[in-house]
Structure formats: C-alpha cells, structure tokens
Regions:
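Nucleotide/phosphate-binding site architecture used for ATP/NTP-dependent chemistry
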Residues: 1-158, 185-341
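Short amphipathic alpha-helical surface micro-motifs
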Residues: 11-15, 164-165, 174-178
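An amphipathic, hydrophobic-aromatic interaction surface with interspersed Lys/Arg
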Residues: 156-172
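A short glycine-rich, hydrophobically flanked beta-strand micro-motif that places a catalytic Asp/Glu
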Residues: 170-184
Length: 341
C-alpha cells in the first residue's frame, strides 16, 4: 500500500511545472519537471540549470540591489530561486540513469506573497490579454476606473522599462514572457514588475556586461560554463542574441496580444500602440545619454529583426533554422505591427 498524501497541499500554476503551496501561501513555490512538450520546449528541467538556479538568482538580485533605479524609476521585484535538488547519473553511468537527469529534480522559489504589501495584487502578464465570459476584457474594470490612455501609459512603462534597463544598462537579457512576468497592481493601477524563473531564461554577453558587473560565479561547477561555447548556456556571442530574447518574449509573444485586445475591444489602433512603445524606448534613451552607444549595439529600432519561429521549432525538430525575420513595429516608420508567427 502507498504512504498516502504527506505534507502541505500544492496546486499547479498556469505554467504547469510550478506548484503553489495552498496550505501555507507564505511557503516556497516548487518547480518540478514535466514530461511534455509545450510551446517550443520539452518541459523537463535542464540538468545543468538546476544546481545553477540559486547562483543565477543571487547574481541577478545583486544587480538589482546595487542599482537604486530598480526601486524608484523602474520598480522591479524578483522571485529568487534559492534552493534546488537534482539526480545526477555520475560516471560511469548507464543510458537509463542518464535519462533520469532533468526528470528527477526540484527548484524552490520565493513565494509571491512575500513580495507584496497590503492592498497589492500580482497578475500574470498574459492575463491582460484575456477575455471574460461576459465578452469584456479582463482589464476592463481597470480601464473604466483609470481611463484607457493613462492606464496603458503606466502599464507599458511599468512592464517594459525594468526589463529594458536590465538589458541596456546591465547587459543582461531576461525572458519576460507572459508567464514569467507578473504585473503588481493596486486597484488595477501598475506598481511594479515582478519576474521569476531565471535558471534557464537569463542571458548575457561577456563584452556587453559593464565593468562593475562580474559574470556569475558557479564555484566548483565553473569549468562547465567556462569550457562551453557561446550560445550553449547563459553566455551569448553578441548583443543581438539579448535583443532577440527580450523583444521576442516581451513584445512579439507578449505585449502584441495586449495590443490586439485593445484594438478589438476599444478600437485602439495597433499601430498607435507600437508608436507608444517606440516613444517610451526613445525617451529612455534620451534620458540615458551615457547608454546610447550600448543601445545602438542592440539595434532595437532597425526595420527588420530576427525572431524565433515557435511553431517550426515544435513541429520540425530537425529544422536547420528556427528563426526568421519580421518587420519591426518599433522602427521609426514601421509599415505594420509585430505579429507572432
């Protein structure tokens, strides 16, 4: 006979692998491997990333703590991964044992409740593009309360600028898609951006890191990352890879859905939406003259940008390329809007 249920009760989140503690919401969220393909990825836990999760979280938190702008101008709250456990096949190992790597693992992440103050809520960013059973958008009560344009301006600034500042000022790309990102609101008004899930969704370029930010220190496992070629783990070959990560996850496969909802529900033209985003990013650059050379290396406003082909990657696992070029709606004179393909 089985042992039966033991300990706290957990409930899976929309991302499936992350479990919330329902018995005590102040306790950690646990991320577990899952043997499915969802979007473009197999949802196990990459073996190398599990023991590295606390290192990456500590590295990111140190960057946030050292820059007061993440507290004032670009409010950013992280949900750090502070502990992990994984099966390692060791050497020598059988094929069966190797197959268990990434399938028997767990990562402990700080809970959302500990990052909120009284009166605040944390809303998954992809909820902003959802429709309710009454035929109105999820965001409609907030739009009615605050007005569409004021609410949108505040939301775009709150969601975009922390990620953009981390990229432009600190040389770190974050995978800020709709499940990893949460909008902290008070009565529907944006307060801060909350980010999670860093163990396999952070990228940097050695030459693009400022001189005061060292590469993450993986301790006794440093050799694994030092010997690995660029683009295999966290270290990328150039700023273009960081731009693609951020613009893919934040704009093309995230905010584009909000733009569509605003157009369908309120007649807010999609091209106007992206012009507003362009002005926000241009204003950031104007306010940060020292960062202009770094922003130029990103090429965020060039007419064509490269983006990941999620469907091709899922259906054609042996495809020679899983990316393609699309018109950039953030160029000064964009002919059309960004569209996920």
């Amino acid at each position: 006979p089985g042992l039966g249920p033991v300990g706290d009760r957990y409930r899976p989140s929309q991302s499936l692998r992350s479990l919330f503690n329902m018995s005590d919401p102040t306790r950690a969220c646990i991320k577990l491997p899952l043997g499915i393909h969802n979007t473009s990825s197999r949802r196990h836990l990459e073996p190398h990333s599990v023991p590295s999760a606390p290192v990456i979280s500590h590295w990111l938190q140190s960057v946030v703590d050292a820059d007061p702008r993440f507290a004032r101008a670009y409010p950013l709250r992280l949900l750090p991964e502070y502990a992990s456990l994984a099966f390692s096949a060791g050497e020598p190992s059988s094929r069966a044992a190797l197959g268990l790597e990434g399938e028997l693992a767990a990562i402990w992440r700080s809970t959302i409740a500990k990052r909120l103050v009284e009166g605040e809520q944390a809303i998954p960013l992809n909820a902003l593009a959802q429709w309710e059973p009454d035929g109105m958008p999820f965001i409609h009560p907030w739009v009615e309360l605050h007005g569409l344009q004021p609410w949108l301006e505040a939301t775009l600034a709150t969601v975009i600028l922390p990620v953009w500042h981390m990229l432009a000022a600190h040389g770190i790309g974050l995978e800020a898609h709709g499940q990893n990102s949460l909008l902290v609101v008070r009565n529907g008004w944006p307060q801060a951006l909350m980010l999670r899930d860093f163990h396999d969704s952070v990228e940097y370029v050695r030459e693009y890191l400022p001189s005061d930010i060292p590469e993450p220190d993986f301790g006794p496992r440093q050799g694994l990352y030092s010997r690995a070629p660029d683009n295999q783990f966290y270290r990328m070959s150039g700023p273009e890879a960081l731009r693609e990560l951020v613009m893919d996850t934040l704009f093309i496969y995230n905010l584009s859905e909000l733009a569509l909802v605003l157009q369908e529900a309120y007649g807010f033209d999609e091209r106007r939406f992206w012009r507003q985003v362009h002005r926000l990013l241009a204003s950031y650059g104007a306010q940060q003259p020292a960062l202009r050379p770094r922003l130029a290396k990103l090429g965020w406003d060039k007419p064509l940008i490269r983006t990941e082909s999620l469907l091709r990657r899922k259906l054609e696992t042996d495809a020679a390329s899983t990316s393609h070029q699309v018109p950039n709606a953030l160029t000064a004179e964009a002919p059309s809007a960004l569209k996920p393909i």
